[in-house]
Curated annotation (Swiss-Prot):
<comment type="similarity">
    <text>Belongs to the PRA1 family.</text>
</comment>
<dbReference type="InterPro" id="IPR004895">
    <property type="entry name" value="Prenylated_rab_accept_PRA1"/>
</dbReference>
<dbReference type="GO" id="GO:0016020">
    <property type="term" value="C:membrane"/>
</dbReference>
<dbReference type="GO" id="GO:0005794">
    <property type="term" value="C:Golgi apparatus"/>
</dbReference>
<feature type="transmembrane region" description="Helical">
    <location>
        <begin position="119"/>
        <end position="139"/>
    </location>
</feature>
<keyword id="KW-1133">Transmembrane helix</keyword>
<dbReference type="GO" id="GO:0030134">
    <property type="term" value="C:COPII-coated ER to Golgi transport vesicle"/>
</dbReference>
<keyword id="KW-0472">Membrane</keyword>
<keyword id="KW-0812">Transmembrane</keyword>
<feature type="transmembrane region" description="Helical">
    <location>
        <begin position="140"/>
        <end position="160"/>
    </location>
</feature>
<dbReference type="GO" id="GO:0006888">
    <property type="term" value="P:endoplasmic reticulum to Golgi vesicle-mediated transport"/>
</dbReference>
<dbReference type="GO" id="GO:0031267">
    <property type="term" value="F:small GTPase binding"/>
</dbReference>
<feature type="transmembrane region" description="Helical">
    <location>
        <begin position="67"/>
        <end position="87"/>
    </location>
</feature>
<dbReference type="Pfam" id="PF03208">
    <property type="entry name" value="PRA1"/>
</dbReference>
<protein>
    <recommendedName>
        <fullName>PRA1-like protein</fullName>
    </recommendedName>
</protein>
Length: 171
C-alpha cells in the first residue's frame, strides 16, 4: 500500500512540476500583435545594430521562437510521412520490448532474447531510416529555423522603451 501512495505522490509532483514549467513557458509568450508588428520592421544600418537587435529579440521573444521551431518540426514530420512512420515504429518497438520487462519473447516453440529483439528492431529501422532521408529533413529544419528566427530577430526593431532601460541601468 505504501508503494502505491509513493507512486501517486511522485505522479502528482511530476504533474505539478510540468504545470509550473508550462506556466513559466507560457508567461514568456508575447502577443501576436506585438510579435508581428509590421511598423517595427526595418533593415538594420550595420552588422553591430543587427547583432544588438538579435540579442535583444532573442531574450524578449524566446518563447515565440521556440513555438515557431516546434511548428516547423511538426510541418517537417508531416511533409515526410515515411520518417514519421519510422519514428513511430521505433518508439512502438522500444515500448513493446520494454513492456516485456527483460523477459524473453516466446513465439510458439521459439524463444527470442531481449537483446535479439533490439538487434532485429535496429536491422529494420536503419534501412528504413536511411530511406526516409532524416538528414535532409534535419538540414531543412535547421535552415528554415535559422531563416525565420534570425530574420525576425535582425529586422525587428526593439521598442523605444528599451533604449531608456539601458540608460537607466548605466546611471
Amino acid at each position: 500500500m505504501s508503494a502505491l501512495s509513493l507512486s501517486i505522490t511522485k505522479v502528482s509532483e511530476t504533474f505539478s512540476e510540468i504545470y509550473a514549467s508550462r506556466a513559466q513557458y507560457l508567461s514568456g509568450f508575447k502577443s501576436v500583435g506585438e510579435f508581428l508588428d509590421v511598423r517595427r520592421i526595418s533593415r538594420p544600418r550595420n552588422f553591430s545594430e543587427a547583432q544588438s537587435r538579435i540579442s535583444f529579440n532573442f531574450s524578449r521573444f524566446s518563447s515565440n521562437y521556440l513555438a515557431i521551431i516546434a511548428m516547423l518540426v511538426i510541418y517537417a514530420l508531416i511533409r515526410n510521412p515515411l520518417l514519421l512512420i519510422v519514428i513511430g515504429i521505433g518508439v512502438g518497438g522500444v515500448y513493446g520490448i520494454r513492456k516485456l520487462q527483460g523477459a524473453d519473447l516466446q513465439l510458439s516453440h521459439r524463444v527470442i532474447s531481449n537483446q535479439n529483439l533490439y538487434v532485429i528492431l535496429a536491422c529494420v529501422l536503419i534501412p528504413l531510416g536511411l530511406f526516409a532521408s532524416p538528414i535532409e529533413t534535419i538540414i531543412w529544419l535547421v535552415g528554415a529555423s535559422c531563416v525565420c528566427v534570425f530574420g525576425h530577430a535582425a529586422f525587428f526593431e526593439p521598442p523605444v522603451e528599451s533604449a531608456f532601460e539601458t540608460v537607466e541601468q548605466q546611471v
